């Protein structure tokens, strides 16, 4: 969709999903996570790349190059604006906008006094990673140590691969594999200018064992790698310090929307499933023969009308192979659906 929208120079590209947009943290881990009402392309790219699942990182680049806005919308709340991703505003204020995390991170630590000022050492090291088909994510270095992270979402990281890699690396340095780890990333513009405001955050990390710290060259993120076992408990505390307590310069309504907890509280209670009211009837049918697939025509009609109300869809089709019952097809035809038969 992003590529088509970019090629057509569309007014916007809409991504419809099961959540209202991108949040300042994973709302299932941090109920106080705030909706991010507006992001620029680069911020959204960083959030998506460092752990957020709602948006694939590769869908942002074509929209950015074509200057096409990208909207994230909720299928269950079609009138809710969600998250709007577009060009950077000239008056954008520096500040952390999101905290994201990834589990299953593997660290490979390499040290040796011989690496200091040795020409081509890193080339020799990374050639061995390439030999085993491994893509390096984060890098931290000193005069006598280089530590890199491997992201399992981009690599096949198992004990056999790591053993072969360690054996190859042992030819040029001492090797230590540290796992399982998790990365926690603070995302926002102007991270270098915000370091003096992160004292409480640094103190929080100071209570745990931090294996690696990496700051991006584009000044958009600051990443800490810790033991996987402590990461989940740290996220709510970090969010409280940075976002919920409004410690950052950026806190305007144009950036932060309501929290996930507020949105869930305000959401209308879901109606009871139709089958609960007809339980006795269904059990009687089950006595005749099982298994049976049961459709409620009133429920089908209601859902068809909800789909019909989505303005972003030009045409709607029903796959006949799902259930070809004449009454079901008749209802869908009355609601303006076409039919797909394969």
Question: Where do the model's predicted regions map?
Answer:
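A charged N-terminal "starter" segment
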Residues: 250-342
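C-terminal catalytic "cap/lid" subdomain
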Residues: 1-261
């Amino acid at each position: 969709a992003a590529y088509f929208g970019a090629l057509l120079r569309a007014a916007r590209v809409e991504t419809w999903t099961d959540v209202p947009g991108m949040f300042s943290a994973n709302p299932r881990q941090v109920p106080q996570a705030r909706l991010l009402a507006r992001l620029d392309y680069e911020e959204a790219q960083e959030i998506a790349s460092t752990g957020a699942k709602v948006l694939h990182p590769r869908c942002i680049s074509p929209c950015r190059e074509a200057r096409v806005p990208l909207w994230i919308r909720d299928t269950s709340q079609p009138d809710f604006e969600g998250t709007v991703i577009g060009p950077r505003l000239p008056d954008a204020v520096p500040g952390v906008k999101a905290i994201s995390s990834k589990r299953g991170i593997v660290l490979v630590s390499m040290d040796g006094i011989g690496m200091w000022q040795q020409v081509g050492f890193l080339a020799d090291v990374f050639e061995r990673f390439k030999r085993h088909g491994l893509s390096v994510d984060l890098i931290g270095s000193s005069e006598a140590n280089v530590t890199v992270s491997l992201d399992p979402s981009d690599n096949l990281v198992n004990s056999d691969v790591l053993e072969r890699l360690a054996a190859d690396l042992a030819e040029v340095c001492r090797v230590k594999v540290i796992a399982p780890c998790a990365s926690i990333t603070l995302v926002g513009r102007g991270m270098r200018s915000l370091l003096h405001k992160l004292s409480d955050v640094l103190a929080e990390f100071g209570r745990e064992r931090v294996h690696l710290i990496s700051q991006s060259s584009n000044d958009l993120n600051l990443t800490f790698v810790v033991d996987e076992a402590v990461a989940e408990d740290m996220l709510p505390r970090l969010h409280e310090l940075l976002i919920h307590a409004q410690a950052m310069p950026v806190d305007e309504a144009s950036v932060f929307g309501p929290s996930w907890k507020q949105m869930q509280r305000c959401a209308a209670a879901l109606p009871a499933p139709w089958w609960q009211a007809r339980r006795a009837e269904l059990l009687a049918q089950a006595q005749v023969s099982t298994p049976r697939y049961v459709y409620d025509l009133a429920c089908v009609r209601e859902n068809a009308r909800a789909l019909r109300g989505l303005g972003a869809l030009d045409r709607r089709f029903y796959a006949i192979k799902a259930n070809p019952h004449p009454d079901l097809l008749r209802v869908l035809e009355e609601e303006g659906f076409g039919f797909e038969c394969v």
